[in-house]
Amino acid sequence: MIKLRLKRFGKKRETSFRIVACNSTSRRDGRPLQELGFYNPRTKETRLDTDALRARLEQGAQPSDTVRTLLERGGLLTKSVRPAEVIGKLKQEEARKKEAADAKAAAKAEAEAKASEAAAAAAAAEEAPAEEAPAEA
């Protein structure tokens, strides 16, 4: 199977990557079948050989996640929703719903506590013996 992935080159801490087509069993920096582009993550510079990339994709080459993102930005692939993104969004949505429900329950409990406190204060006021006003002389 042919994979489209990044091949690292450059100095330490100043890396750049070549987008290459290679066998899926070959090493990351091994000899590629074909060089298809360039990507510099520091300057966000990207150069793509669009004709060669289209040909490799039509032959069934599978891009890595990073290369897929670069191809989507370059307009060679349509943005697709990946299962991991869907799962992440669903978990976030569930967390938001749970947080909203917890906040609602806390507000309800607080309102009930205030109501019972007010009722207790009113009952205490009714039960307290009324003090007589001192007689005016």
Swiss-Prot record:
Biased composition (Basic and acidic residues): 93-115
GO cellular component, as recorded: cytoplasm; small ribosomal subunit
GO biological process: translation
Low complexity composition bias: residue spans: 116-127
Gene Ontology MF term list: structural constituent of ribosome
One Pfam family per UniProt: Ribosomal_S16
Biased composition (Acidic residues): 128-137
UniProt entry tagged with the keyword Acetylation: no
Region Disordered, annotated ranges: 93-137
Keywords, ordered alphabetically: Ribonucleoprotein, Ribosomal protein
InterPro entries tied to this protein: Ribosomal_bS16, Ribosomal_bS16_CS, Ribosomal_bS16_dom_sf
Protein family (similarity comment): Belongs to the bacterial ribosomal protein bS16 family.
HAMAP family from the UniProt entry: Ribosomal_bS16 (MF_00385)
PANTHER family documented for this protein: 30S RIBOSOMAL PROTEIN S16, SMALL RIBOSOMAL SUBUNIT PROTEIN BS16M
The protein's name: Small ribosomal subunit protein bS16
